[in-house]
């Protein structure tokens, strides 16, 4: 399985090595920070035999949000700090025994969903549809030494990424996603009945 990678120390699923199978998204992620410097995409192959993989796409979206809350704060209020602990206890998954975690990448627009959700502005019935609007891709997080040992770099596959081209694509994608998400949140489809604070 060939993957493109951008290394992160701390991110959505905690400390690990983050990859995607989508090379175009990898290019955008390589230059998504406002440093105005060109980036690189490195290609790796991951042998997934004998690896224990947690795929958040196979679980309720609330489990993914709980994992996100473990590592990133969606708000800094007392209410959020109290309720997020309860939310994680109820919907969280113990990821400590997994070699690889697969799931959505919580980029700016995805994190916008999380913030609106904890403010009780989003009904759980539209959460999955909201996630589909971002178009920001699926990522893999390499968590264990065993998984690291099964990574092989394609040294001839590195690609230089122009900041001026792909940072603009990244920003345009994010703007479109936020607009689409905002429209859905403000639509009649969002009943605002089954919300964050009602789930305990």
Which residues make up each language-model segment?
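A short, exposed loop/beta-hairpin motif centered on an aromatic-Gly-Thr core
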Residues: 13-18
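Short, small-residue-biased leader/transition segments that mark boundaries at the very start
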Residues: 1-5
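Conserved NAD+-utilizing ADP-ribose enzyme module
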Residues: 7, 11-12, 32-38, 43-200
């Amino acid at each position: 399985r060939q993957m493109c990678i951008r290394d992160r120390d701390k991110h959505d699923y905690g400390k690990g090595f983050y990859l995607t199978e989508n090379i175009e998204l990898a290019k955008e992620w390589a230059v998504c920070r406002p440093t105005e410097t060109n980036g690189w995409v490195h290609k790796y192959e991951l042998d997934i035999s004998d690896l224990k993989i947690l795929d958040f796409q196979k679980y309720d979206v609330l489990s993914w949000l709980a994992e996100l809350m473990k590592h990133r704060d969606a708000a800094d209020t007392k209410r959020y700090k109290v309720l997020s602990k309860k939310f994680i206890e109820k919907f969280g998954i113990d990821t400590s025994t997994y070699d690889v975690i697969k799931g959505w990448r919580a980029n700016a627009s995805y994190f916008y969903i999380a913030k609106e959700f904890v403010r009780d502005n989003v009904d759980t019935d539209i959460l999955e549809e909201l996630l589909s609007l971002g178009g920001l891709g699926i990522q893999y997080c390499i968590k264990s030494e065993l998984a690291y040992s099964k990574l092989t770099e394609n040294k001839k596959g590195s690609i230089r990424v122009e900041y001026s081209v792909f940072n603009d694509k990244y920003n345009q994608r994010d703007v479109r996603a936020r607009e689409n998400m905002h429209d859905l949140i403000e639509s009649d489809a969002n009943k605002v009945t089954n919300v964050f604070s009602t789930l305990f």
